[in-house]
């Protein structure tokens, strides 16, 4: 793990059922109830509520960009640290796209199920377009 500097920040992506990722990053973006937010090192402290069916992007200091479908929860920024605390989350590569598309096509699906499925499909499409 790289030493903390003004060029990077500590990031934790955690869901109720598991810790998805923890490490140093240069950029994080997420969809909150107030809109899309991008965080770089040195950002002012803040607390935001994540949307259902949102996407989180993390640009780690080392390795490839991380994209996750995130369903509800909170996003906090404090001195040098970003924490994404989600009700549930999955990496784009873990998404069963066919299943998510079936939910989107199901007219009996609830609004929440539709938002989650939309977020899952968008996460996969974002990785595919990179």
Curated annotation (Swiss-Prot):
Cellular compartment(s): Cell membrane
Known partners and oligomeric status: F-type ATPases have 2 components, CF(1) - the catalytic core - and CF(0) - the membrane proton channel. CF(1) has five subunits: alpha(3), beta(3), gamma(1), delta(1), epsilon(1). CF(0) has three main subunits: a, b and c.
Protein name per UniProt: ATP synthase epsilon chain
Keyword Membrane: yes
Protein origin, superkingdom: Bacteria
Gene Ontology CC terms: plasma membrane; proton-transporting ATP synthase complex
Lineage of producing organism: Bacteria, Bacillati, Actinomycetota, Actinomycetes, Mycobacteriales
Family: Belongs to the ATPase epsilon chain family.
